């Protein structure tokens, strides 16, 4: 029962992706689709002037992007949850 539900859901997702791909005329379709699904801009990291999640940083220099903070322990940018 679980396997058939999973296969049905996977089939619907595949149908959606194929339908969207057939209508898309851009060559950067996979990047565009992933960007829309995850609502993040990780593919254009070179364009921004700040460091994103997982990038190395120096604590106290404020190099990380908004909503990120430099970890004193690990020395990389992580998501700041406001604590």
UniProtKB/Swiss-Prot annotation:
Give the subcellular location. Answer: Secreted
Q: Which domain of life is it from?
A: Eukaryota
Any one Gene Ontology MF annotation carried by this entry is:
ion channel inhibitor activity
Modification sites for Leucine amide: 81
Q: Which PROSITE patterns does the record associate with it?
A: HWTX_1 (PS60021)
Query: Which Cys pairs are S-S linked?
Result: 50-65, 57-70, 64-77
User: Which InterPro entries does the record match to this protein?
Assistant: Huwentoxin-1, Huwentoxin_CS1
Q: Which Pfam families does the record associate with it?
A: Toxin_12
For this UniProt entry, which residues form the secretion signal?
1-21
For this chain, the family text in UniProt reads: Belongs to the neurotoxin 10 (Hwtx-1) family. 15 (Hntx-3) subfamily.
- Outline the subunit composition: Monomer.
Function per UniProt: Lethal neurotoxin. Selectively blocks tetrodotoxin-sensitive voltage-gated sodium channels (Nav). Does not affect tetrodotoxin-resistant voltage-gated sodium channels or calcium channels.
What is the protein name for this chain? Mu-theraphotoxin-Hhn2j 2
To which species is this protein native? Cyriopagopus hainanus
């Amino acid at each position: 029962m679980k396997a058939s539900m999973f296969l049905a859901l996977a089939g619907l997702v595949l149908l959606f992706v194929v339908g969207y791909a057939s209508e898309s005329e851009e060559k950067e379709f996979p990047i565009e689709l992933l960007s829309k699904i995850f609502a993040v801009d990780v593919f254009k990291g070179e364009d921004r002037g700040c460091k994103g999640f997982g990038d190395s940083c120096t604590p106290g220099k404020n190099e990380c992007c908004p909503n990120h903070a430099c970890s004193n322990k690990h020395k990389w940018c992580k998501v700041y949850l406001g604590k």
